[in-house]
Amino acid sequence: MTLIGWFQIALFCAVVLALVKPLGAYMTRVFAGERTILSPLLAPIERGLYRAAGIDARHEQTWLGYGLAMLVFHALGFVSLYAILRLQDGLPLNPMGQAAVAPDLALNTAVSFVTNTNWQNYGGESTLSYLSQMLGLTPQNFLSAATGLALAVALTRGFARASSRTVGSFWVDLTRCTLYVLLPLCIGLTLFYVWQGMPQTLGASVDATTLEGARQTIAVGPVASQVAIKMLGTNGGGFFNANAAHPFENPTALANLVQMVTIFALGAAMTNVFGRMVGDERQGWAILAAMGVLFLAGVAVTYASEAAGSPVLNGLGFSAGNMEGKEIRFGIVASALFAVVTTAASCGAVNAMHDSFTALGGLIPMLNMQLGEIIVGGVGAGLYGMLVFVLVALFVAGLMVGRTPEYLGKKIEAKEVKMAMLAILCLPLMMLGLAALATVLPAGLAGPANAGPHGFSEILYAFTSAAANNGSAFGGLTGNTLFYNTTLALGMAVGRFMVIVPALAIAGSLAAKKTLPASAGTLPTHGGLFVGLLVGVILIVGGLTFFPALALGPVVEHLAGAAGQTFAAGG
């Protein structure tokens, strides 16, 4: 570890923190329907969209109506994307003549992008046409991200409102998120990335002659526009198979920094939106502080592990750090920081191969996802996931003192706690249950390229990433099989919607309650004590669930490496 490395980490954190208040203030005005700097340009478009769709912007929905609208919308998105992938060989904008995507891979890909996971069992430049990338994947990148923001706002309204039957309009929230937040920022980011050297073209791949005289095909395409939303919307699906390790997808150190910042920007700002909407910004800062504690701890462990290098090689006298699977132009610190950022948010983009990290260096990205993607998390999804843990933390505190817990003047009762636990428990059920299934079936055991604990880690990481809607992977797993395409699709769908629906039920229940004044026995939820309680509950309730599985994978791999033991390749 070096001073320059820690300076890079500090610079990243400073830039993200500087964006929290201005972005939070702007998005609060957007969600409240107030006038913004873009209203003269976008308000007529917004009204036109409502008229075309027959939507009354003043009509709000109950939590059930909001949820049903969301589910129907996503079902239609899945069908349309699946159809594009299956028919791409007969559709235009296919200069490289890509064949139709196989049914099981199309299923996996459609579920992946609709759920904001962007797990990719294919290489983008060798499998998909430009039309599939632009008309199929990119709209889902926008809409799945906007859905996460909309749902976070709906849950926030549950805390902010009193004696209300409604939590907002899904159609209005979705439109405003896309039109006023995602689209303008992505246009600016696309221009920036083109300036940095990313391709943005509809032309076919370029044939070039190398210095050795060999012919090489260089894939290009509408890269910059897809990278803009894949990072801002915490989607993570790469245009190229190498994702952000590809020089056309991450050409410079400045582009690398901006991509990391945009992964966190909206998720961090949503904590400020929450504070503003409930009338106490300190509540948002407390939630962000809890996220920050977990994030910085993860960065420190990952950076230290990668800088220390492999225990096996260290025992042989080599101590240059672990550069396997990393771009030399980024180095250890930028690779480690990117890995923690992309898994703390539900992004999944990578600028290094996580499968090549040390055992402890790979454990932290996996643990980030297993906690439920609540360390900033996906746009919107991180906030509503963290608020679920807030309710559980207050319930635990209430048990310790023998009184009904309260949060922002709302009593937290049995219904809210049951819904919160349902949202929390569905993730380990999918992550551990499907991983266990894969370890006992021949089709599952055929996937990992490594034997021993690292092979198990590859399986566990895959289902963890799918259920957490992250999309990153340990690349040693062969995932493009019928077994993995279908089971991963199941994990992605359950991990997305079985968290969303309970969160909306909580929103509806809280919105209907009256707001009570704080009393002498009310636990302050804006100070260090509450931040510590929240972090502790997250680690105990969320983290300990996975300790036995982690002990069989990265933990035993690290201990074996420290003892000089290695495992042969092959499943």
Swiss-Prot record:
- Annotated membrane topology: Multi-pass membrane protein
Q: Where in the cell is it found?
A: Cell inner membrane
Q: Name one GO molecular function term.
A: potassium ion binding
Bilayer-spanning residue ranges: 3-23, 64-84, 135-155, 179-199, 254-274, 284-304, 330-350, 357-376, 421-441, 488-508, 527-547
Domain of life, per lineage: Bacteria
User: InterPro entries annotated for this entry?
Assistant: KdpA
Name the Pfam families on file: KdpA
Say yes or no: keyword Acetylation present: no
GO CC annotation terms, alphabetical = plasma membrane
Q: What is its main location?
A: membrane
Which PANTHER family does this one have?
Answer: POTASSIUM-TRANSPORTING ATPASE A CHAIN (PTHR30607), POTASSIUM-TRANSPORTING ATPASE POTASSIUM-BINDING SUBUNIT (PTHR30607:SF2)
**What family is this protein classified in?**
Belongs to the KdpA family.
Against NCBIfam families, the record matches this protein to: kdpA
The UniProt function text for this chain reads: Part of the high-affinity ATP-driven potassium transport (or Kdp) system, which catalyzes the hydrolysis of ATP coupled with the electrogenic transport of potassium into the cytoplasm. This subunit binds the periplasmic potassium ions and delivers the ions to the membrane domain of KdpB through an intramembrane tunnel.
Give the quaternary structure: The system is composed of three essential subunits: KdpA, KdpB and KdpC.
- What's this protein's name? Potassium-transporting ATPase potassium-binding subunit
Q: Which organism was this protein described from?
A: Methylorubrum populi (strain ATCC BAA-705 / NCIMB 13946 / BJ001) (Methylobacterium populi)
